[in-house]
Design a protein with these regions (language model features):
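Solvent-exposed alpha-helical segments within well-ordered globular domains of core cellular machineries
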Residues: 7, 11-14, 23-26, 44-45, ...
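Conserved, well-folded catalytic cores of nucleic-acid-processing
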Residues: 12-19, 28-31, 49, 53, ...
Length: 276
């Protein structure tokens, strides 16, 4: 290809915002000549390369904006350490069909069993698929909502939690809330109901959410909306953080209490589809 034509292609690519093509046109032409590509194959190569770079850039930006503390994947999760957890069900969630139907995912279990890892892995997969994601702990979210309310910016702050396609709320139950704080959580869940997906992690069974939220009526109302279209994963295994300290590893109860039992909303909740 002549230098004049190469220069003109680079100028066109720059004006079209195709920065990768501008930088690699000579290399791509050489590859096409080596592989004896036809015209259509060469055009497909050019567009595929540019699209791949743009998608990679979009994915990195989405991860940066998500607030995820760790970029986990399901491939990193040790399912053999949690034998009661069905890998097939988790991988079914990773298809992200629950996001398409504005459903939720709740992960229940004691500290250290991998709830946040799984929530983060689903969130990373959602970012990669083009969904907007935001991660927060319940305590941090409530703190920001209270500060916003005190400064007359409550609706604006609440909207920031309504905007993402997927909102991950970590550590529900680690710190109790008062009734005013629980009401803020109710407003959030109510506004997102059937409009956007939530991924929740909690170390408390649903029966204990009344204590966590400081009000049984509010807890029931929140769970009613949260569980209407929800996949619940209960993890009852040992802690990953203690697995290398055998002397400290507690013995797992062979008959653990079902964390999904006990609340009226949990009893009446019906899954959208049978478990995988």
């Amino acid at each position: 290809m002549s230098t004049l034509v190469t220069t003109r292609i680079r100028e066109h690519a720059t004006r079209l915002g195709m920065t990768h093509l501008c930088e690699t046109v000579s290399e791509l032409v050489a590859r096409a000549e080596t592989d004896q590509m036809g015209y259509l194959d060469f055009v497909d190569l050019l567009l595929g390369e540019e699209l791949g770079v743009r998608e990679g850039r979009r994915f990195r930006n989405a991860l940066k904006l998500s607030g995820l503390p760790h970029h986990k994947s399901l491939d990193d999760f040790d399912f053999t350490f949690q034998p009661d957890l069905e890998p097939r069900k988790v991988r079914d969630l990773a298809t992200l069909e629950f996001i398409e139907r504005h459903g939720n995912v709740t992960l229940l279990g004691p500290p250290g069993v991998g709830k946040t890892h799984l929530a983060s892995a689903l969130a990373v997969a959602a970012c990669q698929a083009g969904f907007s994601v935001y991660f927060t702990s319940l305590d941090d979210m409530v703190r920001k909502l209270k500060l916003a309310e005190a400064t007359g910016r409550f609706n604006r702050q609440l909207t920031s939690y309504l905007r993402p396609a997927v909102l991950v709320v970590d550590e529900v139950g680690y710190l109790p809330l008062d009734r005013a704080e629980a009401n803020m959580v109710f407003q959030l869940v109510s506004r997102r109901y059937e409009r956007g997906s939530m991924i929740i992690t909690s170390n408390k069974s649903f029966a204990e959410w009344g204590q966590v939220l400081g009000d049984d009526v509010l807890a029931t109302a929140i769970l009613d909306r949260l569980l209407h279209h929800c996949d619940v994963l209960a993890i009852n295994g040992p802690s990953y953080r203690l697995k290398d300290r055998l002397g400290l590893l507690p013995t797992t109860d062979p008959h653990p209490q079902d964390p999904t039992a006990g609340s009226d909303a949990a009893k009446t909740a019906k899954p959208d589809r049978p478990a995988a």
